[in-house]
């Protein structure tokens, strides 16, 4: 028991890095995903096609590969030539990748709204922006909560990929202790950390779903 307690400090430090990446990614990817979704359903076919290509690229290639490209290959790209530090490179990769996934969730939510509501809003004199803001998006939020919950939980687990950039996240901290002490106990404790984080997220999304369900009654 004393050994397990001694692991909490180092693993908590790693969990801090994990949570930091998780929060920053959400703050960037959710609004970017919404913008991409609105562009995806836009009447401008060129814009819609461009966004569709972006989503295809980000969803069709591994997140780890994107992260390695941004960190190691970006400096050699003409015009850009910027080398990002480890953590910012991870943030950029995660935000761009998850924005594509969130965009598809938002797009499905937007397109699930009955077309008659758009026509009704038009009769009332609402602009496209007002229709989206007052009618479509509020209903969309309620419908996308389950897939958003799944994707957000996946994000927590995907943060472990940043070990390839030598960032001392939760998994890397556990791995270092395992190699030092020749025991798998740190992995079990790290798993408990991940389970607690996903449990909190699951509880939060369930509360949101219940709250919206009450409004529908």
Give each language-model segment a name.
Residues 1-217:
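Transmembrane alpha-helices and adjacent helix-loop boundaries
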């Amino acid at each position: 028991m004393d050994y397990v307690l001694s692991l909490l400090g180092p693993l908590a430090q790693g969990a801090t890095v994990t949570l930091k990446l998780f929060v920053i990614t959400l703050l960037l990817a959710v609004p970017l995903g919404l913008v991409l979704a609105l562009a995806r359903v836009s009447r401008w076919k060129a814009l819609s096609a461009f966004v569709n290509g972006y989503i295809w690229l980000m969803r069709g290639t591994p997140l780890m590969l994107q992260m390695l490209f941004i960190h190691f290959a970006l400096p050699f790209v003409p015009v850009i030539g910027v080398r990002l530090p480890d953590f910012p490179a991870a943030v950029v990769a995660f935000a761009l990748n998850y924005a594509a996934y969130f965009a598809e969730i938002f797009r499905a939510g937007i397109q699930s709204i009955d077309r008659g509501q758009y026509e009704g809003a038009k009769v009332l004199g609402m602009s496209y922006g007002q229709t989206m803001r007052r009618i479509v998006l509020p209903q969309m939020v309620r419908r996308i909560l389950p897939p958003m919950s799944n994707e957000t939980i996946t994000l927590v687990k995907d943060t472990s990929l940043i070990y390839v950039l030598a960032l001392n996240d939760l998994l890397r901290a556990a791995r270092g202790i395992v190699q030092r002490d020749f025991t798998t106990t740190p992995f079990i404790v790290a798993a408990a950390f991940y389970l607690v984080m996903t449990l909190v997220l699951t509880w939060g999304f369930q509360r949101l779903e219940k709250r919206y369900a009450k409004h529908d009654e």
